[in-house]
Amino acid sequence: MRLFQLLFRASPATLLLVLCLQLGANKAQDNTRKIIIHNFDIPKSVRPNDEVTAVLAVQTELKECMVVKTYLISSIPLQGAFNYKYTACLCDDNPKTFYWDFYTNRTVQIAAVVDVIQELGICPDDAAVIPIKNNRFYTTEILKVE
């Protein structure tokens, strides 16, 4: 009986502290989903005029699908398939991989860019979202010609 009397006399701050210790910290903000996860792979070095294959793997952790446009940008002009732009529907259960084959005889810095865009006719039933915070993601690599 005396225990219950002590419990009812406890200050609100003490009760709040006990409640927080029982519930634990809120981890809702620790598990934010990543909009775009990308992995850009090119060789570190090649010989002049060797064919180079650039590979960009893209995925998302969002539950909703997005329309993405992927392309490469270089520090010097490159010709051929390097200039191809790909548009695809990216969903969490369907990652995409894009390939570019090109030639170069000079060292070049290359950026792989992923833009989240609004375009009809790409995702099923045109059901796609556009993130408010970020809609462009990129990574850069240097391709040395030796």
From Swiss-Prot:
The keyword Aminoacyl-tRNA synthetase does not apply. Glycans are attached at residue 105. It is found in: Secreted. One of its GO terms (molecular function) is identical protein binding. The modification Pyrrolidone carboxylic acid is found at residue 29. It holds the Pfam family SVA. The keyword Disulfide bond applies. It comes from the Eukaryota. PANTHER family: PROLACTIN-INDUCIBLE PROTEIN, PROLACTIN-INDUCIBLE PROTEIN/SEMINAL VESICLE ANTIGEN. Monomer. Interacts with AZGP1. Belongs to the PIP family. This is Prolactin-inducible protein homolog. It comes from Pan troglodytes (Chimpanzee).
